[in-house]
């Protein structure tokens, strides 16, 4: 892949608020269609053999619920119930995992009061536990520091500790 081995795509966020500035990057508002698009994009990047010169490691982002930010505002809070999380938000991410995506990127938002980058339920319990994801999780640009702004961490050291404990493997 011309010396480029890793891409921070595809974005597989489901969004139902056209005001959100990143809505055009995702797979739409339907989790079934979004899942099919997620699979196609992962397979398009990674193909069947990552040692082939025309392949690149894909990253499913933004884990999770970034597309459900309140009022369509980027970086805003996300307050959703388990039904929406499990039946609408997560299916395209699970589809990406099942298609063999090698990395996940966590999100800037919080999910019900817990920043995505330090969210144990999302990263450790669901992604690495229930789904048995063996790749690694990278933060979005400086998203681990969002734990400070959300009031969960007092400084960058505590934010990094909380993120690693929750399942984040690499800080971008």
Describe these PLM feature segments.
Residues 1-172:
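Glycoside hydrolase catalytic-domain context in secreted enzymes
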């Amino acid at each position: 892949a011309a010396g480029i081995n890793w891409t921070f795509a595809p974005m597989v966020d489901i969004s139902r608020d056209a005001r959100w500035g990143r809505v055009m990057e995702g797979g739409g508002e339907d989790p079934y269609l979004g899942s099919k698009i997620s699979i196609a994009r992962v397979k398009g990047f990674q193909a069947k053999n990552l040692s082939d010169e025309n392949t690149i490691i894909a990253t499913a982002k933004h884990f999770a619920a970034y597309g459900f930010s309140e009022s369509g505002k980027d970086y805003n809070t996300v307050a959703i119930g388990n039904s929406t999380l499990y039946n609408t938000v997560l299916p395209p991410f699970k589809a990406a995992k099942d298609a063999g995506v090698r990395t996940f990127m966590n999100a800037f938002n919080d999910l019900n009061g817990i920043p995505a980058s330090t969210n144990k339920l999302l990263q450790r319990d669901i992604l690495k536990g229930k789904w048995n994801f063996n790749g690694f999780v990278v933060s979005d640009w400086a998203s681990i520091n969002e734990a400070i702004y959300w009031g969960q961490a007092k400084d960058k050291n505590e934010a990094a500790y909380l993120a690693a404990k929750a399942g984040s493997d690499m800080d971008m």
